[in-house]
Amino acid sequence: MTKRTLSNKTRYSILKLSGFRARMSTAQGRKTLKARRKKGRKQLAVRR
């Protein structure tokens, strides 16, 4: 089994990587959000 990389991260550091504002800051992140909206995801990004 592979190592779970988020197991020892703080909530703040996770948000810095995969929170909504982090997604909006890059073109690739905006593309990700667009895809999740299209699919109908209730939760677009990691919540705090």
Swiss-Prot record:
Residues 31-48 have a biased composition (Basic residues). The keyword Transmembrane does not apply. The lineage of its organism: Eukaryota, Sar, Stramenopiles, Ochrophyta, Bacillariophyta. It is found in: Plastid, Chloroplast. Gene3D superfamilies: 1.10.287.3980. GO terms for biological process: translation. Residues 23-48 are annotated as: Disordered. The keyword Cell cycle does not apply. Its main location: plastid. Keywords: Chloroplast, Plastid, Ribonucleoprotein, Ribosomal protein. Coiled coil: none annotated. InterPro entries: Ribosomal_bL34, Ribosomal_bL34_CS. GO terms for molecular function: structural constituent of ribosome. One of its GO terms (cellular component) is ribonucleoprotein complex. Belongs to the bacterial ribosomal protein bL34 family. This is Large ribosomal subunit protein bL34c.
